[in-house]
C-alpha cells in the first residue's frame, strides 16, 4: 500500500482541522499497550487498530521515541513528530465518557509521524531507525507536558528547542512559558 505525504492511500481523516496534515500523516500505536487496556477495560473487544492507528507497532513506546527520529518502514521513511491528543471520537468509539481522560493520564498515546519519503508499505513491515534525535523531546516527555507536568521548565525549554517539533506546538509551549514567567514576575 502506498504511504504518501499526507496519509496511507485510502485513509481519510474526518476533520482535517484537527486530524491529518503533514505532521500527523500516519499514527502508530504500540502493541505493548493493548494488555494494559484489556485490564483497564475488561469485556471490551480490543482488536489491533482499535485506537485508530495506521500501524500497530512493536518496540516503539513513547519513552523510546524522540521528536525528530527518522525511521524506515517498507520503502517509506517517516519522522517522529508529536504525540496524540485524543478527540471526542475516541470516547464515542469506546462508548465511555471517561476515555479521553483515561487515555491522557495513562501516557499511552502512540505517536504521529510525518512522511519524509513516500514509498510502499505492507502488513508485517517493521520500523527500523535510520537516525536518532537523542537531544529532542521524547513523546513521553511531551505527554507529561500536556497531561501531568504542564509547567516543567526543563521540559518546556527542551520542547521549544526541539527542531522537528511542529510550529503550532512550539508556539503553544512558548505561550505557556511566557504565562509562567509573567506569573512568577508579579
Where are these regions (language model features)?
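Hydrophobic, well-ordered secondary-structure segments
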Residues: 109-112, 124, 139
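Electropositive, beta-rich accessory/interaction domains or terminal extensions
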Residues: 1-92, 98-99, 131-186
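Loop/turn positions that initiate beta-strands
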Residues: 68, 118, 123-125
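Short loop/turn positions at the edges of beta-strands in beta-sheet-rich folds
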Residues: 59-61, 107, 117
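Hydrophobic beta-sheet segments that form the core/acyl-binding groove
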Residues: 127-129
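A mid-sequence, solvent-exposed acidic-amphipathic segment
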Residues: 97-114
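A generic structural motif
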Residues: 85, 108-110, 118
